[in-house]
């Protein structure tokens, strides 16, 4: 049976990638269908109840700058907020929030249900309709066919999902949800490289059975940070503390003596797990010299006693889980509400994707999230937004878009994936970005919101707020530049008294602010200026203090951009380019980079090879000009 009306974009999956993809497409005015196996789990946080962190909050802020839902949903559900790396420079500062799992999901669903141009339908997708290497629609579990020329797949851990607890395993997309088996078989028929990855989650604990008095309390920050550029602290629900405890020698002994019952170490699990979020058995094995590991006890919400013990993800048998949990200080009488488990699932080599996240072999088929080999809500949401945007652009007959590495962490994420691929779940860090001084979480809106407005992602309310902030920054910079402080005046003496810095001649306030010992708030206090929007003040201070470094980075970007953006023809024959080694010819032929910049980042492709490619392109261009003139 065919559904009575046609859509322009269909999104499969209602997790963090799927919701952002569907919302982005619909915001752009495109008729969009979100197909989910269960409406009740839209926006569900399958693993830890937290958003943000090092590198990850940069992605959340970029999603927000492009009109996405994740940051606002976090502000409305966050029960603890902290700024990490607060004593370090602004490039690596990161906001992290504990979220009430139930509130977060409810907020996401409310946003979805109130989004114009978006339809939601509950059914699993079992098949894709593909004709002449072009996607035409999808077929659901009950045989209902939906038609659209663009489909975004955001299957998470559901594609061929297999759950492991000890040496026992069963099919599942996550605990309590069925896997996508029929779709997994269908996807393996396509000419795409497929692999298996693994992730895991810890047992959940009943908070009433925990002794917090022997743990270290970890409260949130004051004043309370916000995640969204449109957010404010008044949105936050009641704030609570997290708690810290540690594993010990007894814990490690329990785990080590039961590794033969671990599916990871007995060869039952084939998929590779996340390097930067290892299971507790992996930690004990890899870091055998460590006497203890931190365990962060995180509340799951305000209306539940469930706790998430971050740091002891495990797939050991239940009896071992119970023993190891009860060996930890403060959890001697702990009751496990849900056992921990590992899950294996299919993913597809992201090198088979374009920058738009459209597959190279099936027109109109886009991938986002864990299907591309990433891990994390934030990485999924960022890909979902980009895939949904490009699916909508395709429906509108417009050029696809992806930010460059020097424009956004989203650009770094996508470029890493489609150029290098991944053999393990990919996680974002600030260290992955070459230009992190200009890719800060605090300026994501200044980098991306104008582009978002051009694409059709930004509504009038957000645009007005952005313009007010942008104009406010410009006005304040001009005011500081044109306001002078002279020695031996009341203002000059106030500056000397405040900062202990003598004034040898007159200075503009902007010159003074550039000094390392001078802060914006203190300068305004000393010189009698008016207090302004804190976001505006923050941008003015950072831009002024880091102006020299930022200018150098911008110059470097400008130098590299000419060759970076040089397009490589789709039909280029690398075997015909003399001077390229067979190895490099093979790597270029396999990856099929879209630009010279992308080619330069393929492991093993040397600067000399890039020079040969550039010469070849110039010769090819000159040859075509001669043909045309003849």
UniProtKB/Swiss-Prot annotation:
Subcellular location: Cytoplasm
Pfam families found in the cross-reference section: GIDA, GIDA_C_1st, SAM_GIDA_C
Molecular-function GO terms, alphabetical: flavin adenine dinucleotide binding
Cofactor dependence: FAD
Keyword tRNA processing in record: yes
NCBIfam families documented for this protein: mnmG_gidA
Database matches in HAMAP family: MnmG_GidA
PANTHER family: GLUCOSE INHIBITED DIVISION PROTEIN A, PROTEIN MTO1 HOMOLOG, MITOCHONDRIAL
Protein's name according to its UniProt entry: tRNA uridine 5-carboxymethylaminomethyl modification enzyme MnmG
Annotated source species: Pseudomonas putida (strain W619)
Gene that this sequence comes from: mnmG
